[in-house]
From Swiss-Prot:
Gene3D superfamilies: beta-sandwich domain of Sec23/24, Sec23/Sec24 helical domain, Severin, von Willebrand factor, type A domain, Zn-finger domain of Sec23/24
Matching Pfam families: Gelsolin, Sec23_BS, Sec23_helical, Sec23_trunk, zf-Sec23_Sec24
Region described as Zinc finger-like: spans on this chain: 213-238
Name under which the protein is recorded: Protein transport protein SEC24-1
GO BP annotations, alphabetical order: COPII-coated vesicle cargo loading; intracellular protein transport
Record lineage: Eukaryota, Fungi, Dikarya, Ascomycota, Saccharomycotina
Gene designation: SEC241
Family under the similarity heading: Belongs to the SEC23/SEC24 family. SEC24 subfamily.
Keywords: Cytoplasm, Cytoplasmic vesicle, Endoplasmic reticulum, ER-Golgi transport, Golgi apparatus, Membrane, Metal-binding, Protein transport, Transport, Zinc
Main location: cytoplasm
Subcellular location: Cytoplasm; Cytoplasmic vesicle, COPII-coated vesicle membrane; Endoplasmic reticulum membrane; Golgi apparatus membrane
Length: 897
């Protein structure tokens, strides 16, 4: 029982509104909250293959007392038998909350292990409404591995889904079976989990002894087998027997014998090596940050220039500088280039600004004094930043020579490499790379949108990235303007150099919310750890090969992805093809990342994943990771939108969903000639149609007129966003605040704030007297119902009437003496707090319409806010699109043809 006092906010005293009111369903649906979804008892489907398998299992089970057939792990006994008896779909989905793999095995009297499989639990999607969105918080289906394939069975022997996820946790043995399923086969990879490398770092092998297969070059891992009395090891990727170096059983500190099973690489599927000299072409370079700052009239007027300078001053000491070799340079840009020459602190306190007026043939004056040591020049950099803020505060130049600035910066640091961080409020309009405003009228929302508005306007922005990749340079963009800046063209710079684009439309530094968002994201970006001179390769065992790559990097060869610098907040998707029939019971993937750290070390991060193989289509479907599938389809849709059209991207999403549903019906559903034909799918896939339906309503793909900068930015973000953020972006989280539990808003034993349960993304569940918090991954909307009682308004906002609620872009003020206000603020802070992303979510306060109003009534700003917030109701008929039920009805009709 909670000790926190809960205040109950009664429903306002009013009658039901007239039917058909825009945006709200006036008759509330009792008992349709997601937590109250009616689950049916599972009825496993029986295919010929499965029938044979079940008969075999039944015979074996007669002699066993602890046989488990339904794959509901007992995580208190991780290496013992599982529970008996049939389980509900809800229990089937209730995997270990940490998402670790299932290594349980049931053993017969003779000691022979019996292969476990995930069972199919079919549901009717149309009877399973509203969709059970709690599934979005579940880990992937268990990976069923026998402990005897690992040298040291443990939950660390196979890679965590935090690092790598496969769309299929049971891999078809043949390409024909894969094609038959119509399911995508891909890996979703996130090499780093935190912005700071010191947080939960994986085990490190510092011995510089690296054991690799001499044929396929995979690294020894927990699934390698020691053979011939331990003198050799068999590669689990290509099956080659390799010699084991004598040092493998010796301590690197002394000559004592060590237990090889205690070695880091044998116990851990995710680990790092300190790389020996043969992995180094040149000594690890120092970290170099070059800031290209717009000082034109636009940047001065909207406050971006001052915001940048103030943030840099505060964050200089927090730039990664572990080895005291970090360097910095600053280039100010308008119609000319203004490069800062800063002396060491112990030499002089006077800096110079070197002006380069010839932007067609820019030269670099005094190059040795333009890229300076942060440790030796920190005080003078601070002084210079304060001085230039005064010098440029009344600049009237309207030009912005970005192209010449980029070329100059590339010459400055090209011998070493590093980061170019561009902060701009203007469309480049001087020198090479000048851009023109594109005419969006009559083009936006048509089939010509991609080719005329979302394409690269100037080839410079693609060819320059090739030069940057050769010289190990990454480009990041911070674009903040209330006017057109051609995100579609500029975003090519980060896309092919492993960078990121940050976009702040309508930026105004005098608005504290705008200022906080920019400064927070800019600060987190420049202070997060990064890797230099990085390459990443994914290997598959015999028969498996990487075939396509998605993300922000430069693809150097057929399977090698190059990152001039690797950030900590991006993920990558690699498609997998089955080249030859897989003859083994298990297959393997290994991701290797070779990198240089800010501490001067060269390292190799190795991530190894083992998956079972199968010839059963039912087992393949039972092991699909629906969120990983959603990530892969999103990448293909982004590629289609950029190369073809938005319409084609939506068609791809819809066709892929239809193909999966049709295949499931054809291969796994027993034909029922009588009664209504249901739209069947397995429980582990039941949220995928919802995600695909919502994805088509995302700003990146929705039909209609969308400003091209916003569309291009949305597409760019989807290219690199990790799964967790991707799902929130596709299907926003809506928290019901007015009736949240007593403990919500307070911290738990781990220090995290307890969040309310989410409700479905539909206005049907939005009470007109309620308070809701909407999180779409980029922004937060605090929605207060138009009929909210005065007590709620007083407790949350400190005002007695709706007319006094501060609508718009505002942070929620603290109300003295109100515990409820404190809890709401704590929840908002929790949703903004994350050490794995640089995103800071701006809060918008929105008041809903009263009983006699519609969405469009009120001020223009309020009506726009309501419509923007309402885009989160993806299950409804928003923006002239189908509701989720209508979408399923359409799918059912197509499947039944």
């Amino acid at each position: 029982m909670s000790h926190h006092k809960r205040r109950v906010y009664p429903q306002a005293q009013f009658g039901l509104a007239q039917a058909g009111q825009t945006g709200y369903q006036d008759v509330q649906q009792p008992g349709v909250l997601p937590s109250q979804a009616n689950y049916q008892e599972p009825v496993p489907l029986v295919t010929p293959i499965q029938e044979v398998l079940n008969n075999q299992i039944d015979q074996t089970a007669d002699s066993l007392h602890n046989m488990q057939l339904h794959n509901v792990p007992d995580f208190n006994q991780p290496l013992q038998g599982q529970l008996n008896g049939p389980q509900s779909p809800a229990l089937y989905q209730n995997y270990n909350e940490n998402g670790m793999n299932n290594y349980n095995a049931a053993f017969g009297n003779g000691g022979t292990s019996v292969k476990q499989v995930n069972q199919l639990y079919p549901i009717d999607l149309l009877s399973d409404l509203p969709p059970p969105i709690k599934d979005l918080g579940l880990p992937p289906p268990p990976i069923n591995l026998s402990p005897d394939i690992m040298s040291v069975p443990s939950d660390k022997s196979n890679a965590s889904p935090d690092y790598i996820r496969s769309t299929l946790n049971a891999v078809p043995k043949t390409n024909s079976l894969l094609k038959k399923t119509k399911l995508p086969f891909a890996l979703v990879i996130k090499p780093y989990q935190h912005l700071n490398d010191d947080v939960n770092a994986p085990p490190l092998n510092e011995e510089c002894l690296i054991v690799r297969c001499r044929r396929c070059r995979s690294y020894i891992n927990p699934f390698a087998k020691f053979i011939e009395q331990g003198r050799r090891w068999r590669c689990n990727f290509c099956r080659l027997a390799n010699d084991l170096p004598m040092q493998f059983d010796q301590s690197s500190i002394d000559t004592n014998i060590v237990n090889r099973l205690d070695r880091t690489e044998i116990k851990n599927a995710v680990m790092e090596y300190v790389a020996p000299k043969e992995y180094t072409v040149r000594p690890p370079p120092p970290s170099i940050y070059t800031f290209i700052i717009d000082v034109s009239q636009n940047a001065i007027k909207n406050g971006l220039f001052v915001s940048t300078i103030e943030t840099l001053k505060q964050q200089l000491e927090y730039l990664p500088n572990r080895d005291n070799r970090t360097k910095i340079s600053i280039i100010l840009v308008d119609h000319a280039l203004h490069i800062l020459s800063i002396p060491a602190d112990d030499v002089s306190n006077k800096f110079r600004i070197l002006d380069v007026a010839d932007i067609d043939e820019p030269y670099i004056p005094l190059p040795n004094s333009l890229v300076v040591s942060l440790s030796r020049c920190k005080q003078n950099v601070q002084l210079a930043l304060e001085k230039i803020k005064q010098l440029f505060e009344i600049n009237v130049s309207t030009k912005f020579a970005l192209g010449p600035a980029l070329r100059t910066a590339q010459k400055l640091i090209g011998g070493v490499g590093g980061k170019l961080i561009v902060i701009s409020a203007s469309l480049p309009n001087a020198g090479i790379g000048s851009l023109q405003r594109r005419n969006e009228s009559g083009v936006s929302g048509t089939t010509k949108e991609s080719s005329q508005l979302l394409s690269c306007q100037d080839s410079f922005y693609k060819t320059f990235t090739v030069e940057c990749s050769k010289t190990q340079i990454t480009i990041d963009l911070f674009l903040a303007s209330d006017d057109y800046v051609d995100v579609a063209t500029l975003s090519n710079l980060p896309r092919y150099t492993a960078g990121q684009t940050h976009f702040y439309p309508g930026y105004n530094a005098s608005n504290i919310s705008d200022f906080n968002k920019f400064t927070t994201e800019f600060s987190k970006h420049i202070t997060m750890d990064i890797s230099f001179e990085t390459v990443m390769r994914a290997r598959g065992s015999t028969g498996l090969k990487t075939s396509a790559f998605y993300g922000h990097f430069f693809n150097r060869s057929s399977d090698l992805c190059a990152f001039s610098t690797m950030p900590r907040d991006q993920s990558y998707v690699f498609d997998i093809s089955i080249e030859d029939t897989i003859t083994t019971d298990y297959c393997y993937f290994q991701v290797a990342v070779l990198l240089s750290l800010n501490n001067g070390q060269r390292r190799i991060r190795v991530i190894t994943l083992a998956l079972p193989t199968t010839q059963s289509i039912s087992e393949v479907f039972a092991c699909v990771d629906q969120q990983a599938v959603a990530a892969q389809i999103t990448q293909r849709a982004v590629q289609k939108a950029n190369s073809s059209s938005i319409d084609d991207a939506r068609d791809l999403i819809q066709k892929t969903t239809l193909d999966i549903l049709s295949t499931y019906k054809k291969e796994l559903v027993v034909t029922n000639t009588g009664g209504v034909v249901p739209l069947k799918l397995s429980t582990n896939l039941r949220i995928l149609p919802l995600l695909m339906h919502a994805l088509m309503k995302h700003m990146a793909f929705r039909a209609g007129v969308v400003p091209s900068d916003h569309r291009a930015y949305s597409l760019n973000v989807l290219e690199s966003v990790p799964i967790k953020s991707l799902i929130t972006s596709i299907y926003p989280s809506i928290y019901s605040m007015h009736d949240m539990g007593d403990d919500c808003g307070y911290t738990d034993e781990t220090g995290n704030v307890i969040l309310p349960e989410c409700i479905n993304d539909t206005a049907i569940l939005m009470e007109k007297y309620g308070l809701y918090l909407i999180d779409n991954g980029s922004e937060l909307f605090l929605w207060v119902g138009g009929e909210a009682v005065p007590e709620l308004l007083s407790d949350v906002f400190g005002v007695p009437e709706m007319s006094q609620v501060p609508v718009g872009k505002h942070d929620l003020f603290r109300v003295e003496g109100s515990q409820f206000n404190e809890r709401v603020c704590n929840i908002i802070d929790q949703l903004r707090t994350s050490d794995d992303t640089t995103v800071y979510k701006t809060l918008y306060i929105v008041s809903g319409p009263t009983i006699n109003d519609s969405f469009s009534q009120g001020t223009r700003e309020l009506a726009s806010l309501r419509m923007w917030a309402a885009t989160a109701f993806v299950e409804d008929n928003i923006m002239k699109t189908l509701s989720y039920r209508e979408f399923l009805e359409k799918m059912k009709k197509e499947v039944s043809k």
